[in-house]
């Protein structure tokens, strides 16, 4: 097991701008700053929650880490070595992204088993479809079903299984339980917690809902209008929030 005291992934002075669209024949005059001077670390064996309202920049941050956003400045390190998100083919298996929309994330023409088997073959894994499904608490018969035949919770488990198939060290989970009912949310969160413990994963858990992470994450980062307004241990943030925005989120949660 690697040293968990050093960050597996760090983001330093990240800023992201998107160009404003000009009107008709007017040239673009300015840019919208979506993220401003973002700094944080992820640690193996730890769940870090990134919390903020819709439009705060959470998904943009996650997308930038894995190279889905081009207009950024800042530095990224994986295991202490700098990397370029726009040229990270060597890290594709190390950092996996799980999206909110579990249905569109899966190929509708492939069964769950075909989807997983394709990944296992490409990466010459010693795992098999049944063992990967078992790790996410799904029965073998799920392998023969198409995405539209699965429940939302089952589809999200298949997406988690697909990420696990390449044996990653970091998972970015983007609102992965927001479309599920409360009972299914709890089961998925328990699954993620177990996987963190068993696989020593580092998790960036993106959510708008503090209720989801209050007893789930070790650390919380609060994002508002593209800026980190507060970060610290989950206990510190939940019991003694310092920033007004964080206080507002917690008050809304308790109401």
Model regions: which residues?
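Helix-to-loop junction immediately C-terminal to a conserved catalytic motif
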Residues: 66
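Conserved ABC transporter NBD signature motif
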Residues: 74-83, 91
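Conserved ABC ATPase "signature" region
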Residues: 126-141, 250-251
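Conserved ABC ATPase signature
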Residues: 146-150, 154
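A short, surface-exposed alpha-helical micro-motif characterized by mixed small hydrophobic
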Residues: 213-215
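ABC ATPase "signature
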Residues: 231-232
């Amino acid at each position: 097991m690697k040293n968990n005291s050093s960050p597996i992934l760090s983001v330093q002075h990240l800023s992201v701008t998107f160009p404003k669209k000009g009107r008709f024949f007017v040239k673009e005059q300015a840019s919208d700053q979506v993220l401003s001077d973002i700094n944080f670390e992820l640690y193996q064996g730890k769940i870090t929650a990134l919390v903020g309202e819709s439009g705060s920049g959470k998904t943009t941050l996650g997308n930038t880490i894995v190279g889905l956003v081009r207009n950024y400045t800042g530095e990224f390190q994986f295991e202490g070595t700098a990397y370029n998100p726009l040229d990270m083919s060597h890290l594709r298996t190390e950092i996996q992204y799980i999206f909110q929309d579990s249905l569109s994330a899966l190929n509708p023409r492939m069964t769950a088993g075909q989807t997983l088997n394709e990944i296992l073959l490409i990466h010459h894994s010693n795992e098999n479809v049944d063992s990967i499904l078992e790790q996410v608490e799904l029965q073998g018969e799920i392998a023969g079903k198409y995405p539209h035949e699965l429940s939302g919770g089952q589809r999200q488990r298949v997406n988690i299984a697909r990420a696990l198939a390449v044996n990653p060290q970091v998972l970015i989970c983007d609102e992965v339980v927001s479309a599920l009912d409360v009972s299914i949310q709890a089961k998925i969160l328990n699954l993620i917690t177990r996987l963190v413990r068993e696989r020593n994963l580092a998790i960036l858990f993106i959510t708008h809902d503090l209720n989801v992470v209050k007893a789930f994450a070790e650390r919380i980062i609060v994002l508002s209008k593209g800026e980190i307004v507060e970060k610290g241990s989950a206990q510190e943030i939940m019991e003694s929030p310092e920033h007004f925005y964080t206080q507002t989120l917690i008050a809304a949660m308790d109401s």
